[in-house]
């Protein structure tokens, strides 16, 4: 199934947290927090301005982003978990 977000919404796939720390400590599932980093899968057309035109989005498909722990709405599509969030919920784009 293909999803196209509406307005200024963004579809994000969470990136999995590391299983082992740099020091070699294995992190059990019960101690893991939800990662606040993800990849942008799809982007809506942008917020609608007063003149009827869409404002340009600051993120695009493929961007790695940081977001608030409680951002977005969790959805499941074809047994995969995603977040749908507003662009305002994205804190930063990670540049390589």
From Swiss-Prot:
Q: Where in the cell is it found?
A: Cytoplasm
Q: Which family does it belong to?
A: Belongs to the GroES chaperonin family.
Subunit info? Heptamer of 7 subunits arranged in a ring. Interacts with the chaperonin GroEL.
| Protein name per Swiss-Prot or TrEMBL | Co-chaperonin GroES
What does the entry give for GO biological process?
Answer: chaperone cofactor-dependent protein refolding
Source domain of life is: Bacteria
Q: In the UniProt record, does the keyword Protein transport occur?
A: no
One GO cellular component this record assigns the protein to is: cytoplasm
Q: What is the lineage of its organism?
A: Bacteria, Pseudomonadati, Thermodesulfobacteriota, Desulfovibrionia, Desulfovibrionales
Q: Which UniProt keywords apply?
A: Chaperone, Cytoplasm
Q: Name one GO molecular function term.
A: unfolded protein binding
Q: What does this protein do?
A: Together with the chaperonin GroEL, plays an essential role in assisting protein folding. The GroEL-GroES system forms a nano-cage that allows encapsulation of the non-native substrate proteins and provides a physical environment optimized to promote and accelerate protein folding. GroES binds to the apical surface of the GroEL ring, thereby capping the opening of the GroEL channel.
Q: List the Gene3D superfamilies.
A: GroES chaperonin (2.30.33.40)
Q: Which InterPro entries match?
A: Chaperonin_GroES, Chaperonin_GroES_sf, Chaprnonin_Cpn10_CS, GroES-like_sf
**Main localization of the protein described in the UniProt heading:** cytoplasm
